[in-house]
């Protein structure tokens, strides 16, 4: 099963059609916040999150960073129409938009087959991850609130 998060209806529609034609079950989210709510309530298996990097409320970058801390085994594939803006950060595999059926399916298969996700973090990410775990740490009575984790992430100073 794949979770596809994008604020563009047309991208979700096309992505769903391409993925379903390849045999994938697809959940859709209109932005990162909705994706977090879906992830927080999902009880079944999820193989991959595909997320637009630039979305309102919670961006795909924030979604990927929170998942790299709290669900490190879950692969994330970023999609964007602004490829030049993300070339400096190579921790997340990126598929440029617009994509073809072939390029999407190839990226999905690579991500799932190779367990591609945010690569091992650099020191800054480790510091942020440690602080994020402290702020949003779960207990036996309270599971991780992924939405609160993004809010905490936004409050963590960089550097």
Give the positions of each predicted feature.
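Active-site residues of response regulator receiver
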Residues: 52
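Charged docking surfaces used in two-component/phosphorelay signaling
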Residues: 13-21
